[in-house]
Amino acid sequence: IYINTDTTASADTRARRVLFFPAGTYKINSALKIPPYAHLVGEGPDKTIIKNSGSNAVMVMQDDDGNVGSNIGNSGATTPTQIQVENMTLRTSVAKVGVSLDRVTNAYFNNVKFHGSYASGGSDSSDAKGVTVTNSTATYTTTNVVFNQCQFTKFARLVDLSFNCTNVKFHACDFKTAYYGALIGAEMDGSTTGLDDGPRDIQFTSSSWSDIGQQAILVSPA
């Protein structure tokens, strides 16, 4: 997204424009990489659908040099920031991740549906996560992320946050059909890089849960 889309404009200008997805199903087989300042807008959940059939996340973050995962921020690259995603469905047809919020600051998801492949009554799967954070460290911490009026359905773990992250908010969201609604801090251990601090200031307000096999929200005692 945004990479080499308009060679007559500066990179900053390209990256700060709204990218509109008309209603339809957009089929991909590898992760959609979201750079700093990206703003994606669809025509509504189950109208604009980005569907990934590959064995990877539907959406991941990248820096302005195109680095992803543990390489985000290398050589002084701008890390993912000021990202907005609105009015669409992010869907995976396999037991993988909806969106991985790696080293991102100031991200806003409004009226987005995260749709996986989990069947009601199924068993847990650590690979099937609607929203997760990986590769976040003390230097590059995921922070200030808002999910507003979003739908999460058919992932074994609709939300799974163990890596360092702060101020992640879910407001007026619907969580449906999963083994866990939200799993918070299950893998943090206080010593491993990225798992030393774990999630902090995670908020759920005015939200609902249904058809959850275990806990709606399970917070690690650590």
Question: Residue ranges of each PLM-predicted region?
Answer:
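Low-complexity intrinsically disordered segments
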Residues: 4, 102, 139-140
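Short, surface-exposed loop/turn motifs at beta-strand boundaries within globular domains
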Residues: 12-14, 33, 78, 83, ...
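Intrinsically disordered, low-complexity Ser/Thr- and acidic-rich flexible linkers and loops
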Residues: 8-13, 65-77, 122-125, 136-139, ...
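Right-handed parallel beta-helix/beta-spiral solenoid domain characteristic of secreted/periplasmic
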Residues: 39-97, 117-122
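Extracellular beta-strand solenoids
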Residues: 21, 28, 34, 42, ...
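N-terminal extracellular ligand-recognition/capping segment immediately after the signal peptide
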Residues: 1-39, 43-54, 89-90, 94
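Structural detector of coil-to-beta-strand junctions
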Residues: 18, 31, 56-60, 82, ...
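Right-handed parallel beta-helix
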Residues: 43-47, 79-92, 105-118, 140-157, ...
